[in-house]
Amino acid sequence: MKPSEKKENTLSHLAIIMDGNGRWSEQKGLPRENGHKEGVKSLRKLLRYIDDFKIPYLTVFSFSTDNWKRPKSEISNLMNLLRKFIQTDLIELHNNNVKLRVIGNRDGIPKDVIRLINSSEYLTRDNDGLYLQIAFNYSGRDEIAVSYTHLTLPTILLV
């Protein structure tokens, strides 16, 4: 297809499940932590180029509720990656007009990480460029249960 024949992008939301980074690392004989770090590097590359494709929404599933079953050292490394990502990349994201939102259950997440999440969401709240959602401590089942509770609670209270 010639460049002049390219159609405008109709994709409005890209969702990525960041899975397999630890296995990738193990296959290469490296610690699982290295794979997780490579996953963050890939996310940074994607964030640099996603604007070229005019995709307004990006959701990255980075830590599922099942990840709590992993060894404590691995969980700690994953929390540190989110910490470091926010601390290192927040200003660049903000300067590039990215609106950052972290979705998922905040129970169990260290308080300092929650403060970083809250401050990053607050800082970028008025940005109207890429809408980046990071699903952290997230599961579809949990989301259904929470939605059900929110839908039925008013009914239960009225009875």
Where is each model-derived feature located?
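Flexible, compositionally biased loop and terminal segments
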Residues: M1-L151
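Single conserved hydrophobic/aromatic residue that forms the stacking wall/gate
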Residues: H150-V159
